[in-house]
Amino acid sequence: MKRKCLALMVCFLMVAFLSGSALAKDKVVVYTSLETDEIDKYREAYLKDLPDLEIHIIRLSTGELGARMLAERANPQADLIWGWAVTNLEDFVTKGMVEPYKPKGVEKLDKKFVHSGFSYVGIDMYIAAFCVNTKVMKEKGLPMPKGWNDLLDPKFKGLIAMPNPAASGTGFLQISSILQMYGAKEGKEDGWEFLKKLDKNMGQYIKSGSRPAKMTASGEFAVGASFDFVVAEQKKQGFPVEFVFPIEGAGYEVEANALLKGAKNLAAAKKFLDWAISEGAMKEYSKFKYGVTLPGIPTRPDLPKFSEIKLYPMDFAWQAKNRDEILKKWETLFLK
């Protein structure tokens, strides 16, 4: 009898062990600078498509993410980057902190958004835009701005919000596009002189790319320098706001994914990166972003058409190479 009970107990423990093994999930740690609103929507998709992964998403602003990765360089705590500005990734490729990986299906993507050595793979793009509160504009008798130059009007003093470029990728693309417009690549200082004039009207620099639009929508500012889909979301929610894409040329950024060197959960990281460029994932991105890197997927209908926007031809390599110098100078001039 004792032997029978012992045998049954052993069988029970084996079943329990095997069941537990079957239910065990592979862990993966993901760093991202995608907006919280986006991640909340994407979560349902990746949980459905990757049921065997235990996915830990850590969301940080663009600047904070970079600082954290540098601090953890000797002992990486994340396995991959999901949706980070190419300008920043270029720098980390140079620093040797990214492991080349060719995710499944990458051949279907537009090649110009894929790193030649597969150090990163672009997934989408966003465009800098002004969020203009029409109610505040009317109350204060302000003219509708068409571009950056219009914001130098003294009437806008204290009524403009803009992202801090040291913390926000959106902020950096805005100031880097202005600097390039004014000849910074040729060594000219005109862009910095323009930013000094703009600073005189600045109400607040904010450590977020989306909050200038959200604060403007709530009536705290007349104009918030932000980016496309955040303005669209505020308008969708019923706030009295309108898009303005700078007539001088709107800056834009590409967001990309990368495998981190020293990833502790390599197989799980690769599985997530495969999913992150799948058609299903791209369709989710397209609900927020201006364009995705998988051809044939339409963008959201409430965003203005590409033909209606003048894009400034951004030089991502120049931006990456000069990023630290630009931010150091910006902080010296404007964070007093």
Sequence positions of predicted segments:
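Periplasmic-binding protein-like
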Residues: 155-163, 194-199, 205-206, 235-261, 276-299
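A ligand-binding cleft/hinge motif common to bilobed small-molecule-binding domains
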Residues: 87-91, 217, 222-240
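Short, well-ordered beta-strand elements
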Residues: 25-35, 53-58, 159-160
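Extracellular/periplasmic bilobal clamshell ligand-binding domains
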Residues: 302-336
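Extracytoplasmic ligand-binding site segments that recognize negatively charged/polar headgroups
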Residues: 33-40, 63, 77-217
